[in-house]
């Protein structure tokens, strides 16, 4: 069974799309403690911290079926003109960002961390996981020209406030995106091709 260390509904939707059996345990880390001018280093550190936080809390019954178990943590940030952007703090900031994005491009980076084990001999997974697989997947996003009216109406829906960068490719914000270069699901918050790769490397499979 896979444990998702995230409260993100978008990431849950991606796992459900694959009919993966999973549970959710929300990590409780202070993201403000993590600072780096390198966006890839930052998303990787955050995804690792989220995974490690859940691993340390997850205690299971060793008498359960002896199946591989993995914990997955992710974190996404948007890089635009040298700035690292998380979720907008308010509607005004969301509007300001989208005005800047008009007819330009940025890169959505998602850090992924999978901690896994292939036996359940110990009750505390944090003391006996078999391996860690971490990586960052990046997708370039090219925006269409956006009018002020469109931007204001979009922000009024509330959708941008919940998204890294301030837009959702799997929601109403999709109409603003001219094209992408790279993994689509990565922009949503979890690269499914990366997940397949990581699970295979961990000796697990999407098809079991």
Swiss-Prot record:
The keyword Cytoplasm applies. Keywords: Cytoplasm, Hydrolase, Nucleotide metabolism. Its cofactor is a divalent metal cation. GO terms for biological process: nucleotide metabolic process. It is found in: Cytoplasm. GO terms for molecular function: nucleoside triphosphate diphosphatase activity. Pfam families: Maf. It catalyses: a ribonucleoside 5'-triphosphate + H2O = a ribonucleoside 5'-phosphate + diphosphate + H(+); a 2'-deoxyribonucleoside 5'-triphosphate + H2O = a 2'-deoxyribonucleoside 5'-phosphate + diphosphate + H(+). PANTHER family: BIFUNCTIONAL DTTP/UTP PYROPHOSPHATASE/METHYLTRANSFERASE PROTEIN-RELATED, BIFUNCTIONAL DTTP_UTP PYROPHOSPHATASE_METHYLTRANSFERASE PROTEIN-RELATED. This is Nucleoside triphosphate pyrophosphatase. The gene is maf.
